[in-house]
């Protein structure tokens, strides 16, 4: 039979039914969109498994295409997520907007300590990186010397400090990202 129930997620005032057809179709499409590398990908699980995004990513997406899941401790959303990210070095990162907001807050806090040449290089790298990524979103060539220099000198160090040196894709679910956080 088609469209049989695979799982029910019970939330505070509601329930969500995930069907077998829905999960299978979504996994197939996600693997195409994310250019999934079989038995190579790893993700960090920090959302409760009662959260539909947490269940889909941490269980079904990994089972469908192979890979590893690093389970963060229960205090991940209270500040220990960074430790797990640095240890796991995820290849794909799936976050809810609040997690991206917290990462942005920490980055802004760290940037305040930069002065002189370090601040100039950091600002240049951020600007060049934004230009590069917005150009590639529009199908235009990105890069250039400023971007390559900024990536090598600044952005690679930031990525390593956050555990994202192997991360090739960042994805958001559950709610829209604000434009400020997206940048």
What are these regions (language model features)?
Residues 169-171, 177-183:
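Conserved mid-sequence domains
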Residues 21, 98, 175-176:
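Alpha-helix/helix-capping structural signal
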Residues 1-27:
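Conserved AMP-binding A3 loop
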Residues 2, 17, 44-45, 70-71, ...:
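Structured core elements
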Residues 161-165:
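Short, conserved loop/helix-junction motifs that constitute active-site signature segments
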Residues 24-42, 49-156, 166:
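Conserved AMP-binding/adenylation subdomain of ANL enzymes
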